[in-house]
C-alpha cells in the first residue's frame, strides 16, 4: 500500500487487464469445482440435510413416546393411589368391625360375669338367711327352755319354729 501510494496508485483504481484475468481465473476455478467437486459438495449437503431431518423426526417420535409413557405412568400412579385408598378404607372398615365385635364380646362377658355374681350373691344371701334362721331357732329354743325351765325335745320345737318362720316368710314375700 505504501508502495502503491508512492507510485501514485490507489487501491480503488481499476486496472482493466487485472479485472479480465481475475474473471477468467474465477471462471476456471468455478468450472474445475463444478467438474470435480460440485456433485460431491451437493451430495454432502443433501446428506447433511437428510440427517438433520431424520434427527428431527426421531426426536419428535421420542417426544411422543415419552408423552405416552408419562401418561401411562400417571395412569398407573393414579391406579396405585386408588388401590392404596381402597386398602386403607378396607382396613378401617375391618378395624371398626373388629372393635365392634370386641366391644360386643366384652359386653357379653361383663353381663355373664354380672349375672354370675348376682347368682352367687343370691346363693350367699340364701345361705346366710338359712344360717340366720337356724341360729334364730336355736336361740329361741334355748331362751324358751330357760324361760320354761323345762327342756323340750329340741327337734320338735325346732320344727315348730321353722314352720312358723316359713309362714312369716311367705306373708312378707
From Swiss-Prot:
Similarity annotation: Belongs to the ATPase B chain family.
Please provide the record's keywords in A-Z order: ATP synthesis, Cell inner membrane, Cell membrane, CF(0), Hydrogen ion transport, Ion transport, Membrane, Transmembrane, Transmembrane helix, Transport
Oligomer and partners: F-type ATPases have 2 components, F(1) - the catalytic core - and F(0) - the membrane proton channel. F(1) has five subunits: alpha(3), beta(3), gamma(1), delta(1), epsilon(1). F(0) has three main subunits: a(1), b(2) and c(10-14). The alpha and beta chains form an alternating ring which encloses part of the gamma chain. F(1) is attached to F(0) by a central stalk formed by the gamma and epsilon chains, while a peripheral stalk is formed by the delta and b chains.
User: Which cellular components does GO assign to this protein?
Assistant: plasma membrane; proton-transporting ATP synthase complex
Q: What does the UniProt entry say about where the protein is found?
A: Cell inner membrane
Locate the transmembrane regions by residue number: 12-32
Domain of life, per UniProt, equals Bacteria
Mode of membrane association = Single-pass membrane protein
**Function according to Swiss-Prot or TrEMBL:** F(1)F(0) ATP synthase produces ATP from ADP in the presence of a proton or sodium gradient. F-type ATPases consist of two structural domains, F(1) containing the extramembraneous catalytic core and F(0) containing the membrane proton channel, linked together by a central stalk and a peripheral stalk. During catalysis, ATP synthesis in the catalytic domain of F(1) is coupled via a rotary mechanism of the central stalk subunits to proton translocation.
The yes or no answer to whether the keyword Transmembrane is present is: yes
Name of the protein described by the UniProt record: ATP synthase subunit b
List GO molecular-function terms, semicolon-separated. Answer: proton-transporting ATP synthase activity, rotational mechanism; proton-transporting ATPase activity, rotational mechanism
Amino acid at each position: 500500500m505504501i508502495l502503491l501510494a508512492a507510485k501514485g496508485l490507489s487501491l480503488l483504481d481499476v486496472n482493466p487487464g487485472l479485472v479480465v484475468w481475475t474473471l477468467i481465473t474465477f471462471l476456471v476455478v468455478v468450472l474445475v469445482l463444478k467438474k470435480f467437486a460440485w456433485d460431491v459438495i451437493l451430495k454432502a449437503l443433501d446428506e447433511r440435510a437428510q440427517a438433520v431431518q431424520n434427527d428431527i423426526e426421531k426426536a419428535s417420535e421420542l417426544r411422543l413416546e415419552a408423552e405416552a409413557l408419562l401418561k401411562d405412568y400417571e395412569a398407573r400412579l393414579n391406579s396405585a393411589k386408588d388401590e392404596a385408598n381402597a386398602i386403607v378404607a378396607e382396613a378401617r372398615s375391618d378395624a371398626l368391625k373388629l372393635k365392634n365385635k370386641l366391644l360386643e364380646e366384652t359386653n357379653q362377658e361383663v353381663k355373664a360375669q354380672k349375672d354370675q355374681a348376682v347368682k352367687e350373691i343370691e346363693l350367699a344371701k340364701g345361705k346366710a338367711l338359712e344360717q340366720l334362721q337356724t341360729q334364730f331357732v336355736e336361740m329361741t329354743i334355748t331362751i324358751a327352755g330357760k324361760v320354761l325351765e323345762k327342756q323340750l325335745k329340741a327337734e320338735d320345737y325346732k320344727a315348730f319354729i321353722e314352720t312358723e318362720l316359713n309362714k312369716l316368710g311367705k306373708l312378707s314375700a
